[in-house]
Amino acid sequence: MVVILAIVEGITEFLPISSTGHMILVNKLIGGEYLSPTFRNSFLIIIQLGAIFSVVVYFWKDISPFVKTKKEFVLKFRLWLKIIVGVLPAMVIGLLLDDIIDKYFLDNVLIVAITLIAYGVIFIGIEVVYKLKNIKPKVKRFAGLKYRTAFLIGFFQCLAMIPGTSRSGATIIGALLLGLSRPLAAEFSFYLAIPTMFGATALKLFKNGLAFTEMEWSYLALGSAIAFVVAYIVIKWFMDFIKKRSFASFGLYRIILGIIVIVLLY
């Protein structure tokens, strides 16, 4: 079960199709009764640690604070400042609503199905409107990304607290609506994931880490390692994909999966 969930996490974490939604669905389908409820719910979040490190490794050249010139330092400083501004909404709202989300939404498969379909429709709708009206992106480079825009994208990220939404999906939708190009929207979504997901993982470890058994810690280590390798491969593929194609195919996938979930489970 741990290996399967780790592979699913690695594949889905940075695609706009909801990793948590897929993890909940897989967890429902393959069981996992031998794991404690507290650990199962925490595992779905903490296993993201491996995927986060894949982002750091893949984009290290772009985000590394170790630079040689003053110009590079200024560019990196501004980039990280925009990332920090972008994660502020999720930090505040996440801390306030974490327990409520865990209690009422985290294990609700119907909500996962509904959000999969809803955001699938939104993705297709955005792409159709952009094509029909021939809308061109206003921001293609990070230098043109304003702090206000980064902050607003951060609010879209908060929507991903509802399982099935997709953190990357919500931030990419927000970025597209605010004028960013597809590649820039995806890249900024990856950057926002670093502090956001580190924070979510740290929060779960702080709340439940002392209750984990030695075996459960080994599950977390194995799952994170597998998620790292798979996620790295997926990031490389995804960044190449969106340079040539739209997000409509991901929207269609979400709708089909959401319908299948409703049919099979209800």
Curated annotation (Swiss-Prot):
Transmembrane stretches, start-end: 1-21, 43-63, 81-101, 109-129, 159-179, 183-203, 219-239, 246-266
GO biological process: cell wall organization; peptidoglycan biosynthetic process; peptidoglycan metabolic process; regulation of cell shape; response to antibiotic
Entry keyword set: Antibiotic resistance, Cell inner membrane, Cell membrane, Cell shape, Cell wall biogenesis/degradation, Hydrolase, Membrane, Peptidoglycan synthesis, Transmembrane, Transmembrane helix
GO molecular function terms attached to this record: undecaprenyl-diphosphatase activity
Major site of localization recorded for this protein: membrane
Listed EC numbers: 3.6.1.27
Membrane protein topology class: Multi-pass membrane protein
Cell compartment(s), UniProt: Cell inner membrane
Enzyme class, UniProt record, top EC level: hydrolase
GO cellular component terms listed in the entry, alphabetical order: plasma membrane
Catalytic activity: di-trans,octa-cis-undecaprenyl diphosphate + H2O = di-trans,octa-cis-undecaprenyl phosphate + phosphate + H(+)
Protein family (similarity comment): Belongs to the UppP family.
Function description: Catalyzes the dephosphorylation of undecaprenyl diphosphate (UPP). Confers resistance to bacitracin.
Additional observations: Bacitracin is thought to be involved in the inhibition of peptidoglycan synthesis by sequestering undecaprenyl diphosphate, thereby reducing the pool of lipid carrier available.
Identification of the protein by name: Undecaprenyl-diphosphatase
Gene name of the encoded protein: uppP
